[in-house]
């Protein structure tokens, strides 16, 4: 990691924390809406990231397993809930997608472990599910009669952030082992990963400041 990437990485974490603070400042006004769970989610993600960064100084643990089995599944399942359960009002879709994602750990452990092509099958599959939900959300917003007021739709900012970060970096994490052999390409994509993560959390902050949502 070069000095620029180190700066981006540190900024990423603190912007996550800043976003959590912005969200918590809006908790009182959203206590009766499901968006309060998004606030809790952002706060927990920051805590998880802080543990991932500094927790090793106090307790020995595998960061790879921590992220693969705790942090990332938590993030994916929350977004499935936010999109399928709440935005689309489809409880069955949420449970189906969550189950499919959890089942993807089976082939990931038994068939793709140690693969030099696919870095993490369960992450790739989870991101693919999220990509489908993102496209569905765009369709919902585009066909909405309230499209003219898209800038006041909190979900617009969330969806854009998820698109840039999770969907935009899907090829990077899927073909990580292949890309690492091409250092220049890998560095460019890693820079994008860090920048898009920062932009995503800034968009999450904007969603609380500018966005409004009924429910």
Residue ranges and their predicted role:
Residues 2-215:
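Terminal, non-globular segments
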């Amino acid at each position: 990691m070069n000095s620029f990437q180190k700066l981006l990485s540190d900024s990423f974490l603190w912007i996550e924390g800043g976003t959590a603070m912005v969200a918590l400042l809006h908790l009182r006004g959203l206590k009766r809406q499901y968006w309060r769970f998004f606030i809790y989610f952002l706060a927990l993600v920051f805590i998880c990231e802080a543990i991932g960064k500094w927790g090793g100084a106090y307790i020995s643990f595998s960061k790879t397993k921590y992220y693969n089995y705790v942090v990332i599944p938590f993030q994916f399942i929350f977004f499935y809930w936010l999109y399928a359960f709440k935005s689309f009002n489809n409880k069955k879709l949420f449970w189906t997608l969550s189950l499919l994602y959890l089942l993807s750990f089976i082939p990931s452990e038994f068939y793709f472990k140690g693969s030099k092509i696919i870095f993490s099958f369960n992450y790739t599959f989870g991101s693919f599910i999220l990509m489908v939900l993102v496209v569905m959300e765009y369709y919902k917003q585009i066909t909405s009669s309230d499209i003219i007021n898209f800038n006041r739709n909190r979900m617009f900012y969330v969806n854009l952030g998820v698109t840039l970060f999770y969907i935009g970096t899907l090829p990077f994490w899927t073909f990580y082992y292949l890309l690492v052999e091409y250092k220049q390409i890998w560095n460019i994509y890693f820079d994008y990963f860090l920048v898009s993560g920062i932009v995503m959390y800034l968009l999450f902050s904007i969603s609380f400041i500018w966005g409004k949502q009924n429910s």
